[in-house]
């Protein structure tokens, strides 16, 4: 099973659709509860979406580079990975400043920025580290992250308290070393330290992709994906007793749990679509094969919709007032 997998395109597309829905609800005052992220510790269905996309980033790296093994010019490949990651990062910055272009209030982190870092580091890991070490790298990194977040004293504060946003090492690093503005006044969910475990989410995708392109029997490969996923879910539950499931911190338990679910979902979609030939996900496939473009287009259109830079009044206000005038209340 080599090359482009329809199941991965579909899964990426479905994930992207939910990312757009979650990020652009229309009104933050009237959002269906499952489409909101957990305030801090805890989990909602929405908290699964972004890590699944990062997982697919890892899978896609393997599917793309595996076809060229033996033909790869490593230096050229490195340059391409760096250049693409840089472009994704710049687009993320553009979405933040558009359409006001207020460079005094720029946010250097964000969804696309995190995707760019995950793509960059996972690409390098795939090129320079033996595949058999991927899981060791993941587990060791997540245990070190767990230790840092639970046991390393915060300068000027003391022992961390993971029950609140302001009393952890990730907050301390972002507050003191992250330039620009943060998503929240005191912390950023795509901050510096939390990017490390998010990269491991991408490495889990590298592991899944490596399994998918191996020469083993397809049934054995899908079962292996499922069982790895199941084990990771149990490991995540174990760590949650000391380091709660928390998307904002990309906690160790959260990384294991979401990675495990992505392993199992990848196995299920591969079986359903690539093995059984289920073909009723055409729209998701279109989104999945043009994911970054679609995400950026949605961001630009929404920014214009809520901006008064063009005609002096928000298009959203015109739309909402028109609905109200016709007796339809947008709640």
What are these regions (language model features)?
Residues 1-331:
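Alpha-helical transmembrane segments and their immediate juxtamembrane cytosolic regions
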